[in-house]
Amino acid sequence: MSHLMSLPIVLLKEGTDTAQGRSQIIRNINACQIIVDIVKTTLGPRGMDKLIYTERDVTITNDGATVMNLLNISHPAASILVDIAKSQDDEVGDGTTSVVVVAGELLNEAKGLLNDGIEPNMIIDGFRNACNVAINKLNELSLNFSNKNEEEKRSILLKCAQTALNSKLVSNHKEFFGELVVNAVYKLGDNLDKSNIGIKKVTGGSCLDTQLIYGVAFKKTFSYAGFEQQPKKFINPKILLLNVELELKAEKENAEVRIENPNEYNSIVQAEWDIIFKKLNLIKDCGANIVLSKLPIGDIATQFFADHDIFCAGRVEDADLKRTANATGALVQTSLFNLNDDVLGTCGVFEEVQIGNERYNIFKECLKTKSVTIILRGGAKQFIEEVERSINDAIMIVLRCITNSEIVPGAGSIEMQLSKYLRIYSRSICNKEQIVLFSFAKALESIPRHLSHNAGYDSTDILNKLRKKHSEQTSDIWYGVDCMEGDIINAYDNCIFEVTKIKRNVIYSATEAACLILSIDETIKNPSSAAGTQRSPYS
């Protein structure tokens, strides 16, 4: 009877792959390190770009979130790094590479602690304690500029935008694009809704040909014969927005009409013409000068509008139609009955202009909602797409800077100051958690270390200089990495600023990701799910 008690009990399906224990935690950490090694070289103003190609497209970028998404990572633990990069991008728009690098460095430090026999739960508790201490110190060191005058505020916003653009492909023109971004955000007024900033791309010309248009602009849609005769400029026009099709439709599949004589066929055709012309006359009678529709506007309607000096555009993208509605005050109509002045919008000036090889419809002086459109120019599609990502990051930074009004000097200076504080704080801890806090402090130094390494300088030498400078009991606590000269620099005096919320989010998200990975002591792989998935090189 006793031998029956020792028989193994099988609960999992045959072929199920399981791995557990401390060795599994280390395997998960090693998988994450592979991802971090790919991304970390993109950090900083001298960071390198990545060329990622698929069957359909080629992408050149150094944006951390974009790189992580395009890697198509399938490893369950490493995919956590993808999630934190995406959440960082959604939340604040920048710091995506930093959050992955810090998380990777925390895991690397944890790996050494695990090998030294420290329990995972103690490491997790220590990391969370260190995170709280670091964030409290960060809040204490933050510089609030809400009491500055408008000129000083604008200058700070400009510096924050330029700092965000420093590590981008357009870093040589950061003054131009920084000014453009700040002007775009300022035009929004109190309604800081990013959806009111449109970005369009036109291939050709120099990136310095990029335009900021105070209004709504979108590319000319497909048009039929007769469009050339329509007026292309209006002053104070009445604008009608539709979600209605204005063209003769072919009969549906297997449709059938039974007639007794040929005259009945003519009456059916005439009825179709009467329906379309009734719709067109309703539009003409409401007094609209411009008609935009999400659905097609056919050749008959195009010629009708041309005869009555009305501009029309069909197949307008939904996002452009919504922005036009918000900017002009027009209401999108799904029916042509009861059209009146209440549903019509207006703007100061409408015109169709040539930009590069494209025609653009532009609505200016929109009083209902302040909107802007940035039209990007550049020689290659991949270049323009990377500029768009850079502009988006800078816009998010400026928006967050306005709403939070808190900044810290960058260039790795804040990380060095927090690292110094954590080292001092760790000495007050009497148990093994002291080692964990010390490791957290060391992990924060990964930002200035990678900044200097990616710039091609001796990171050990620069880190030693920074540690010495920050250990001195002076008010000069804002020394960071000078990526251009290979030395240290006062980030505050040189106006290198970053939004406090970015740094706060980086520390918090990186800590939570590291703690989550450290808390996984067993991985179970279902054989049925494994059979249907193709193995990724990063799994």
UniProtKB/Swiss-Prot annotation:
A GO molecular-function annotation: ATP-dependent protein folding chaperone
InterPro entries referenced in this protein's UniProt entry, alphabetically: Chap_CCT_eta, Chaperone_TCP-1, Chaperonin_TCP-1_CS, Cpn60/GroEL/TCP-1, GroEL-like_apical_dom_sf, GROEL-like_equatorial_sf, TCP-1-like_intermed_sf, TCP-1_chaperonin
SUPFAM superfamilies: GroEL apical domain-like (SSF52029), GroEL equatorial domain-like (SSF48592), GroEL-intermediate domain like (SSF54849)
PROSITE patterns in the cross-refs: TCP1_1, TCP1_2, TCP1_3
Entry keywords, A to Z: ATP-binding, Chaperone, Cytoplasm, Nucleotide-binding
Domain of life of the native organism: Eukaryota
Cellular component terms (Gene Ontology): chaperonin-containing T-complex
Gene3D superfamilies: GroEL, GroEL-like equatorial domain, TCP-1-like chaperonin intermediate domain
Any single GO BP term: protein folding
Name used for this protein in its record: T-complex protein 1 subunit eta
Organism from which the protein derives: Plasmodium falciparum (isolate 3D7)
Species classification: Eukaryota, Sar, Alveolata, Apicomplexa, Aconoidasida
